[in-house]
Design a protein with these regions (language model features):
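A general secondary-structure junction signal
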Residues: 139, 305-307, 389
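Alpha-helix boundary/capping residues
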Residues: 89, 106, 128, 159, ...
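Glycine-rich ThDP/TPP pyrophosphate-binding loop and its adjacent helix/strand module
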Residues: 181-379
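Conserved acidic/glycine
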Residues: 2-121, 311, 318-321, 325-411
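Short, mixed-charge, low-aromatic patches
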Residues: 40-47, 54-57, 75-84, 112-116, ...
């Protein structure tokens, strides 16, 4: 044994023991703040027409601001929109549940991160964004892909690695894209400066569109996130930085990894907005307000969406070694975004229970059909390995393959 190793062991023997962390080390009260699914009530008697707009009051705890005027505690909606929001959240959950089962059947391989419990984030953001606004996120991206123009079939087929996949079977779970959705990115936090770059391009081309650059609480301490904040503020970019705070970065609670878990306050001179993201109407209202703010020439905004994932970090994580089953069940029973919207619609008389059951059944049938169609799609042909790497017309003359003797010539 070297002298260095002996000294290290002697030092370790004299050191004070570190505090032990248990699953209950973080008070549940600090975890669950702002996570109630209660939201709102109509400001007026509901119109008879399903398409006619009316306003609902949002819960007084829907928003918190940091050097920022929070949105009004109201959302203008219609019976049709409420039903659509419910239907979309149910379909997103059904899609993710199907992916869970297909993974366990070994029909999906590799990385797979699901968003069960977080449906109000993707659905609510899409309801509040302009169609031309851009969005980029990390690897928990399946619902965003569908909401930004993909299909359930294209997502499932991509998970299978088939030609009908949104990335033609070459991207997998973490790499899905549409014309307004820039992924689906596998490197923790790396998408945030890319999002700032997208916002710069929009500003440069004067498109009057906003970019929503998303990341999780687990990525919030990455240096590149703060570098992106700095450049976006310096250049007054139309960028909304969105921390999707589901309370755990892999198996580490937010309180154990961040000295300040009020993520919406971490932008220094960038204003912040915290949102109850278990309420789809609050998410929609906040997203619309954020887009209008940054497109008004005010520069970036830091928005924190407080949510909760029911499953593990990925399908290789059972999700119960670092939190109790009671904690998960409490969230399911008290703050579920789908059940919360369902209860309000029934209470307001927007829809009958039978209609919601029909929607639930239709969502299951749509996902089941998408799965079967995805299974029929063929595997990508080997020669497609060389395609979709460069923008058409910008390819080099040739590219080296798996070894120096394998050469593919584009021209």
């Amino acid at each position: 044994m070297s002298s260095f190793s002996r000294n290290l062991l002697r030092t370790a023997g004299k050191a004070k023991s570190l505090p032990a962390y248990s699953r209950n080390a973080v008070p549940s009260s600090s975890r669950f703040v702002q996570l109630t699914a209660e939201a709102s009530r109509p400001q007026q008697e509901l119109p008879a027409s399903k398409s006619e707009k009316f306003k609902v009051d949002l819960n007084r705890d829907a928003f918190k601001g940091y050097n920022f005027d929070v949105p009004k505690l109201e959302w203008e909606t219609s019976k049709d929109e409420l039903v659509d929001l419910y239907s979309e959240m149910v379909k997103m959950r059904r899609m993710e549940m199907a992916a869970d089962q297909l993974y366990k059947q070994k029909l999906i391989r590799g990385f797979c991160h699901l968003a069960i419990g977080q449906e109000a984030v993707a659905v609510g953001m899409e309801a509040g964004m302009k169609p031309s606004d851009k969005l980029i996120t990390a690897y928990r991206c399946h619902p965003f892909t569908v909401q930004k123009g993909g299909t359930i079939k294209s997502v499932i087929a991509e998970l299978f690695g088939r030609e009908a996949g949104i990335s033609k079977g070459k991207g997998g779970s973490m790499h899905m894209f549409t014309p307004t959705f820039f992924g689906g990115n596998g490197i923790v936090g790396a998408q945030v400066p890319v999002g700032a770059g997208i916002a710069f391009a929009q500003q440069y081309m004067n498109t009057n569109d906003a970019t929503f650059a998303m990341y999780g609480d687990g990525a919030s301490n990455q240096g590149q996130v703060f570098e992106a904040y700095n450049m976006a503020k310096l250049w007054t970019l139309p960028c909304v930085f969105v921390c999707e705070n589901n309370k755990y970065g892999m198996g580490t609670s937010a309180e154990r990894s961040s000295m300040n878990t009020q993520y919406y306050t971490r932008g220094d001179v960038i204003p912040g907005l915290q949102v109850n993201a278990m309420d789809v109407l609050a998410v929609a209202a906040a997203t619309k307000h954020a887009s209008n703010f940054t497109l008004g020439g005010n520069g970036p905004l830091l928005m924190e969406l407080v949510t909760y994932r029911y499953g593990g970090h990925s399908l290789s994580d059972p999700g119960t070694t670092y939190r109790t089953r009671d904690e998960i069940q409490t969230m399911r029973s008290s703050s579920d975004p789908i059940q919360g919207l369902k209860a309000r619609m029934l209470h307001w008389g927007v829809v009958e229970e039978a209609e919601l059951k029909r929607i639930d059944k239709a969502a299951k049938e749509e996902v089941d059909q998408a799965v079967e169609e995805a299974k029929q799609s063929p595997q990508p042909k080997e020669e497609t390995l060389w395609t979709d790497i460069y923008y058409p017309g910008t390819e080099p003359d040739w590219m080296r393959g798996r070894d120096r003797t394998e050469i593919h010539r584009y021209r």
